[in-house]
Amino acid sequence: QSKVVTDSIYSQVLKAHRAYTIYLPQSYSNETDRKYPILYLLHGMSGVNTSWFTDQRVKDVMDQLVASGEACEMIIVSPNAGGNPATCWNGYFNMPGWAYEDFFYKEFLPYIEKTYRVKGDKRHRAIAGLSMGGGGTASYAQRYPDMYCAAYAMSALMNIPVSGEEVGRDPDPTNKMAVLTRSVQEHSC
């Protein structure tokens, strides 16, 4: 039986616990010498680490895909990148007072790949995300092309509000961080 587990990691970078939810395939508990490919699955704005597993039923979908032979067994992990859902969602990027990208690459990814039996190389590591998570996916795939064999950015959010800005409010565009746009400019050929 596959399983979904929610846990947390303390981040020295963010000075806080950050939750994550992880899908472990059916053979994970029995085949203790086996390592698995991994998909980092980034939630959208107003989502949390559990959203992919509750709203989009990742466990059920993966179990069906593996059973039909359409997908191989893999580990899927979704970290929480949200802030206060009523006001601000800082997301997957570094900005004043929020160094999430540093946390992701210096703490989270190494922790996951050490704690769980992950094939921790480019050939076996992918990233995907929706909305805010799609923006994180596109930016990370461009900034760290040697890290991922595949990236899937769904409806990528281009403008990330400045930390503390109210979601849905449209402040002066000169005050917004267009992280993905900047990433495209800096990392494209």
Predicted regions mapped to residue ranges:
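Non-catalytic cap/lid and distal C-terminal segments of serine-dependent acyl enzymes
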Residues: Q1-C189
